[in-house]
Amino acid sequence: GNVIMPGQGAVYFSLGIHPMYIDDRVEERLQKIELAAAEGKIVAVGEAGVDRNALAPVEVQLKLFERQAEIAGQYGLPLIVHGVRAIPELITAYKKCRSHQKWIMHGFNNRREILMDLLRHGFYISAGRHAMNEESQVYRVLPEIPADRLLIETDNSDFTIGEVYGQVARRRGIAVEELQHIVRMNFDRLFKL
């Protein structure tokens, strides 16, 4: 995945094993992630997580997720978390890892109770393409995401990052420039580049 610094055009990389792409090369890929982390070639680990739509059993996904979380923790990197119908399992994994690293809930689109649970556990919340739909769950809860935990993404959608910023800023009742400043501060705090 790519991590792009707001307003700078600089591109940094994350590396992870997405739950949809678990195969027989997992050990080799984990070694590559660890090597990239050790050599400072990535700024985060992920996407990593649990997706109940994936072919791999949830138990296999969880074990792999926990191993990637360990790598992130070992090298002091944030973890970009993918979760589909598996938030309780991810929060349990967070507690089990006793992680002091920052975890980013990628592509958040869930109800208020889930948002509050993630926030209680220290997660950052990344809003993206789902925020463009005024009927979506994330659109409804956007004003409730604390400014110091908010990130913006596109996740390769048909929307530009500018469009997502515009929609999120309108929903929160702030100027796009203010939202860019908020995200920049969060980005700097998370990635320490």
Range-by-range predicted roles:
Residues 1-193:
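Mid-domain alpha/beta scaffold segments of enzyme catalytic cores
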